[in-house]
């Protein structure tokens, strides 16, 4: 399910072959195993976890109000935005898209809390802002 849509997004965004990091990490994530990866910029780290997470999410065929199924923590606002954009880009051809909320500084914490309460499948957050939100609860 959704493999054709993911493959179409890969083609539309000029992805041809997986990088070595993606070849190692994607199977681990699909097996629901943790992976800690350190590699240089541009090595494909983000796609190595975003793609299998989207595949696993799509296979579950969740119904009803969205609930947080995925939490991605990033050290910086810029990286959180990059990861969020990757989720959007790779799910662009899905008929049912995952609901994504970015929890980052520089935006209204009240609106972010409201977005979470409305329901979301994926949260991408900076650690600092997530701690701020948890302190408010």
Predicted feature locations:
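Walker A/P-loop NTP-binding motif
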Residues: 23-35, 46-64, 86-91, 131
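Conserved pre-motif I regulatory segment
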Residues: 1-38
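Proline-centered helix-kink/hinge sites
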Residues: 18-20, 27, 52, 75-77, ...
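Conserved nucleic-acid-binding Ia/Ib motif block in the N-terminal RecA-like helicase ATPase lobe
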Residues: 5-8, 63-135
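The conserved Walker
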Residues: 39-43
